Amino acid sequence: MALSAEDRALVRALWKKLGSNVGVYATEALERTFLAFPATKTYFSHLDLSPGSAQVRAHGQKVADALSLAVERLDDLPRALSALSHLHACQLRVDPANFPAPGPLPAGDPRPALPRRLQPGAAGVAGQVPEPRDLCAGFRVP
């Protein structure tokens, strides 16, 4: 899904506001994922998953760095995220079906308009994670 110039500008403006806190927010999102979806912990059994652990913060920073790369290269997300997609699909054997993209906000959602306007950007990034069978010969979900 191609993003409009307005969508790209909106995503970049938000990212600029997040500034140096992107790693903190990504870590918090990771911790919330572990709480809301405990099954995701199986992919991180080698880490200390206690809130605020150095290992969770380090992985949160990796997520933040990947998202920052995506924001820098919004015009070419497939190429920007291809190495990351290959790593997760072929080496780590992560099934993208376990990590669905966030759905749209309901029409009457009382939250501010900004998150709704950013949905195309989030969907654009999530949509760049190809099916493992498209990347890796013989892929099977463990």
Swiss-Prot record:
Single GO BP term: hydrogen peroxide catabolic process
Signal peptide segment: none
SUPFAM superfamilies xref list: Globin-like
Residues that coordinate or bind heme b: H59, H88
GO CC terms of this entry: blood microparticle; haptoglobin-hemoglobin complex; hemoglobin complex
InterPro entries membership: Globin, Globin-like_sf, Globin/Proto, Hemoglobin_a-typ, Hemoglobin_oxygen_transport
One Gene Ontology MF term: metal ion binding
Domain of life: Eukaryota
Keywords carried by this UniProt record: Heme, Iron, Metal-binding, Oxygen transport, Transport
Cited PROSITE patterns: GLOBIN
Residue ranges of domain Globin in the record: 2-142
Family (UniProt): Belongs to the globin family.
PANTHER family in the record: HEMOGLOBIN FAMILY MEMBER, HEMOGLOBIN SUBUNIT THETA-1
Record protein name field: Hemoglobin subunit theta-1
Source taxonomy: Eukaryota, Metazoa, Chordata, Craniata, Vertebrata
